[in-house]
Curated annotation (Swiss-Prot):
The lineage of its organism: Eukaryota, Metazoa, Chordata, Craniata, Vertebrata. This is Myelin and lymphocyte protein. The keyword Transcription regulation does not apply. The chain crosses the membrane at residues 25-46, 54-75, 93-114, 126-147. GO terms for molecular function: lipid binding; peptidase activator activity involved in apoptotic process; structural constituent of myelin sheath.
Length: 153
């Protein structure tokens, strides 16, 4: 009974099928929007270094971790083991929580920038907030599908 339960659920894809399965297809969009967040925050003025430092940490950490995971999935490093399904679900739940906190803090930092900063820097931060919330949504959706896959594995 235990081997059937371990092999009966969804497994992680390997090779280029990573780009054709629903939750793993979101890696591409997480990569794009996460990269845009840290590029925009890095290019703008930083009114609150501690707040935007957290935003930078979260966006760069998730960018590097997402890149690492997608490369490991493409080369098939997981070998079909269920522990990787658990890792995938745990990572995406943590990333979703971190990105939500970073999005709220970036919005707070942007609100405080209304006066005394250039129009360009203010709009860069507005774009960073929008892309940060999009990245948060992507990580939440990926986390939900990863938890469903984890439960069925």
């Amino acid at each position: 009974m235990a081997p059937a339960a371990a092999t009966g659920g969804s497994t992680l894809p390997s090779g280029f099928s990573v780009f054709t399965t629903l939750p793993d297809l979101l890696f591409i969009f997480e990569f794009i929007f996460g990269g845009l967040v840290w590029i925009l925050v890095a290019s703008s003025l930083v009114p609150w270094p501690l707040v935007q430092g957290w935003v930078m940490f979260v966006s760069v950490f998730c960018f590097v971790a997402t890149t690492t995971l997608i490369i490991l999935y493409i080369i098939g490093a997981h070998g079909g083991e269920t522990s990787w399904v658990t890792l995938d679900a745990a990572y995406h739940c943590t990333a979703a929580l971190f990105y939500l906190s970073a999005s709220v803090l970036e919005a707070l930092a942007t609100i405080t920038m209304q006066d005394g900063f250039t129009y360009r820097h203010y709009h860069e931060n507005i774009a960073a907030v929008v892309f940060s919330y999009i990245a948060t949504l992507l990580y939440v959706v990926h986390a939900v599908f990863s938890l469903i896959r984890w439960k069925s594995s």
